């Protein structure tokens, strides 16, 4: 895998984005001239959305890493109803890929965090990363005590570039025409900034992992790696190395194995919302590893954990119960409690939102197995969301807490569809909808 130094100066990062904007513009002009010469009359959208332009955007965000890359990730997951499918699909590849930093830059970061003699704490340290993402990359190592560990190392000075990167990238995407100019992404962008600041605090993530490790300690099907506190800093996170296969590889497994894995993850979600009051909201499939020998799922990456109030979880308890009862006034009341509706919403817009919510709740609408593989749920939700925003002009963004919870739920829907699972989700959910199971803290 090729590596490249992470640009960390404000002007070098802004310059990279500016050059990308120029490249997109020149491609539009060149392709437009070529099409006109051939007698065609292409729309500006078609010129902007050319495969070459989209590929340039995705590649540049992967090189920049950090907030620039995270905006692409968030748009591909959260704004699928607003941006074209071609851009969403290409941005989606950013969820699992970033260009790693070279060994010299890696060594500099580790020396800053652990001191110049850091290698004495290890009998082996693999400098080539086993994974790379938006905030950092992961390395395999053996400590001098003989423990095999995974070391997550944050890219240099990424934290300093978060706010400006988010603003610069969204400006770039707007000016280039890759996203609608009149779409209101401000709430999403503010949350992207806050989430990135949280994810850049590895001590905070370590504490979240330790909480989940303790909560799931007696669980036979789910496991969270132990943290090595003495080798963890604000920018380096060290944990037990846990082997496993990407959960997507279960597409080749027996139906019972796929069913069990997805059941475990839905049950965990309901436990997080209604018992823990804290949810790991990142839906990235790479956060799950499957261990075939034991059937356990390893849970990774807790940088995007969010804590929820009892009022919020009570709102979702009411929402799910109303959806099960097909009680639209109850759904309306629950969504209002959650803070879902804008004050200026029109009656026809509210009706469309209720229809959208009922579609999203189809897996719990009946007390029977739901066929995720055949339901085409993601496409129908995208189409309804697109109609609501583009045709009816309803741009209101739900509260951040709801937005990130919806990402997690949507991620499980996508995983269940990918693994072609048929599952009675209502049966898993119902025990958590009784008042005594809801978080009271």
In which residue ranges do the predicted regions lie?
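Short helix-adjacent coil turns
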Residues: 326-327
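Short amphipathic alpha-helical recognition elements used for nucleic-acid or partner binding
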Residues: 315-318
């Amino acid at each position: 895998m090729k590596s490249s130094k992470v640009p960390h100066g404000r002007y070098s990062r802004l310059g990279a984005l500016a050059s990308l904007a120029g490249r997109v513009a020149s491609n539009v002009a060149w392709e437009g001239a070529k099409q006109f010469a051939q007698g065609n009359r292409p729309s500006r959208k078609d010129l902007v959305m050319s495969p070459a332009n989209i590929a340039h955007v995705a590649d540049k965000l992967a090189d920049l890493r950090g907030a620039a890359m995270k905006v692409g990730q968030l748009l591909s997951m959260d704004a699928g109803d607003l941006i074209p499918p071609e851009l969403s699909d290409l941005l989606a590849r950013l969820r699992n890929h970033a260009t790693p930093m070279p060994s010299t830059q890696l060594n500099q970061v580790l020396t800053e965090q652990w001191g110049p003699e850091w290698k004495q704490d290890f009998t082996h340290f693999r400098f080539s990363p086993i994974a790379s993402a938006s905030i950092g990359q992961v390395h395999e190592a053996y400590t001098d005590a003989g423990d095999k560990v995974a070391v997550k190392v944050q890219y240099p000075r990424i934290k300093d570039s978060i706010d400006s990167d988010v603003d610069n990238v969204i400006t770039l995407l707007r000016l280039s025409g890759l996203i609608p100019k009149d779409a209101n992404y401000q709430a999403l962008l503010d949350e992207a900034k806050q989430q990135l600041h949280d994810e850049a605090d590895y001590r905070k993530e370590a504490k979240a992992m330790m909480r989940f490790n303790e909560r799931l300690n007696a669980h036979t099907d789910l496991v969270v790696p132990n943290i090595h506190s003495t080798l963890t800093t604000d920018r380096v996170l060290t944990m037990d190395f846990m082997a496993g296969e990407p959960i997507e590889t279960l597409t080749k497994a027996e139906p019972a194995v796929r069913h069990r894995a997805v059941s475990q993850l839905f049950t965990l979600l309901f436990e997080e919302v209604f018992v823990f009051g804290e949810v790991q909201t990142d839906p990235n499939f790479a956060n799950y590893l499957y261990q075939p020998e034991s059937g356990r799922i390893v849970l990774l990456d807790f940088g995007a954990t969010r804590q929820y109030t009892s009022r919020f979880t009570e709102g979702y308890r009411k929402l799910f119960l109303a959806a099960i009862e097909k009680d639209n006034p109850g759904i309306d009341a629950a969504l209002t409690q959650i803070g879902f509706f804008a004050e200026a919403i029109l009656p026809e817009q509210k009706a469309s939102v209720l229809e959208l919510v009922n579609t999203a709740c189809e897996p719990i609408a009946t007390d029977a197995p739901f066929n995720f593989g055949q339901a085409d749920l993601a496409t129908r939700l995208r189409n309804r969301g697109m109609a609501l925003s583009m045709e009816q002009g309803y741009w209101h963004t739900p509260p951040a807490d709801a937005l990130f919870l919806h990402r997690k739920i949507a991620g499980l829907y996508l995983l269940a569809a990918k693994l072609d699972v048929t599952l009675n989700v209502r049966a898993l959910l119902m025990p958590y909808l009784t008042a005594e199971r809801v978080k009271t803290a």
